[in-house]
Amino acid sequence: KFFKSKWHIEQLHPPQYEAMEAVFSKSNILLAIPTASGKSLVAYIAILNQLLTLNPGSRAVYIVPLKALASEKFEELKEIGAEIGLNIGLGVGDATAEAKNIEDCDILICTSEKLDSLMRTKSELMSNVSVVVADEFHLLHDATRGPTLEINLTRLRTLRPDAQLIALSATVGNCEILATWLD
């Protein structure tokens, strides 16, 4: 209802529709489709499916590479959360009011660097994670950001092996190899 009434989304694009089977079966997903084709919507649906249907009371982690992207996702998810009673937290390394919501949030949007810090200092925050979204997943190959992302995902998979992992990218190469790694 929200997506139709607030964002005027009448139907899913074919790649989004094809991803729904994996979303609802709780499978890990590598969604590699072009920019502005609706990857985030698939991730949002996966998050809502986990938090509202499959694992109420659990937490979602949405990993992004940049503060600007974190702020964008925070605003979008805050709008969704306000409609359905989910609290959204933002972790980008700043001591902002949003950062104070990290411990009480249902959905945590954060940079890889902030997630790394949280897993070292407040690992209990990850104890009830049911879904992890890795946006701009192609940065796994980046010499600067890739190692932190890979370590974070590996740690999360160790801490929460049953958590659903949604990897999003418009430009990732080696899809088959990376999809195998996700599973």
PLM features: residue spans?
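Conserved adenine-nucleotide phosphate-binding loops and their immediately adjacent elements
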Residues: 1-5
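Conserved P-loop/Walker A NTP-binding site and adjacent catalytic elements of P-loop NTPases
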Residues: 6-183
